[in-house]
Amino acid sequence: ADKIFEETKKIINAFIQRITYVEFLPEILNAETLKNNELNEGIYGYEEFTDPRISNVFSTAAFQFIHSLTPSSIEFDGTETPLMDLFNNQNFLFLDTEKVAVYMMSSAGEPMDRFFSKQLTDHYFQSGNISFDLVAQIIQRGRDHGLPSYNTFRRHCGLPRLPHFYAMEAANVLKAVYHNIDDVDVFVGGMVEIPLPGSLLGPTFSCLIARQFRDTKFGDSHWYESADPKKGFNEGQLKSIKAMSAAKILCDGFGLSLIPENPFRVTSPSNPMVVCADLPGLDFQPWFLLGNQI
C-alpha cells in the first residue's frame, strides 16, 4: 500500500511539473526566454546550490500579473454573474464542476495590460459599501515585504536602468503618482512594460518569472526527468508520462467527451476540439515489476 501511494504521488507530481513547464509556461513566456533559461523539456541536471524556494518578488509582484487576465463576470447556464458575487462563494463550484471547467476553457481572459477589472479594484470582497482594492493591496504588500524598486530589478535582470518616466509606457500617469523614476514599484513597472514578441510579459517580469521557474526546476533533486532511478522514472515510465496532457487529465477528471486540443487556449481553427477518447492515457505497463506489481 505504501508503495502504491508513494508511486502515485510521484506520478502526479510529474504530471504537474510537466504540464506547467511544457504546456503552461509557453503561453506566457516566449520561446527565446524559455530557451535562455533552460525551461524546455529534456534539459535537466540537479544543481545542489540552486535555491528552489519561491522568491519574494515572484510571489509578491511578478506572478501577480495573472490578475490582469481576470474577467469581470462569468456566464453560467446562460446567466451572467459579476465576479463580486462569487468571492467567498464556493457553492457554485460544486453545483456542476463540468460546466465550470467547460466555461473556463471556452472563454478568453482579459488582455494582459495595466488595466484591471473594476470587480477587483472597486468591489473586491465587497460587504455593503466597503470593499478592497486588489491592485492597491499588491502594491502595498510589495512595500511591506521590502521589495526594491522597478529599476533595481531591471538592473538585477541585466536590463538598463530607465533614466526618466518618458522611457516607460503610461509615462504621464506614472509621473503624476511618483516623484522619482526610482520610486516606481516593481509590480507597477512590470505591468506597464510592452510585452516581448510572442510573450504576455515585458522584459522584467519575463526575467523574474523565468528565473524562478528555472530555480524551481534545477534546484529540485526529485524533478521528473531526474536520472536517479529512485527519484525519477525509467525510460518506459517517462515515455508514458510524456504522452499524458492537460487535455487528457481534464477529460478524465470531468468526464468530458470533447475538449480543445490545447485547453489553455480557446477553441479556434488552430486549436480545434478533439475527441477525449482519442487522447492517449497513462500506460501502466512500464510500472509492472518482475514478480511484483505496483
UniProtKB/Swiss-Prot annotation:
Source organism, top-level taxon: Eukaryota
A GO BP entry: response to oxidative stress
Residues the record marks as carrying a glycan: 129
PROSITE patterns tied to this protein: PEROXIDASE_3
Location(s), subcellular: Secreted
This protein's record includes keyword Amino-acid biosynthesis: no
Keywords: Glycoprotein, Secreted
Disulfide bonds listed in the record: none
InterPro entries for this protein: Haem_peroxidase_animal (IPR019791), Haem_peroxidase_sf (IPR010255), Haem_peroxidase_sf_animal (IPR037120)
Known tissue expression: Component of the acid-insoluble and acid-soluble organic matrix of calcified layers of the shell (at protein level).
Major localization class: secreted
GO CC field: extracellular region
GO molecular function: heme binding; peroxidase activity
PANTHER family reported in the protein's UniProt record: CHORION PEROXIDASE, OXIDASE/PEROXIDASE
Homology family: Belongs to the peroxidase family.
Name of protein: Peroxidase-like protein 3
Source organism (scientific name): Lottia gigantea
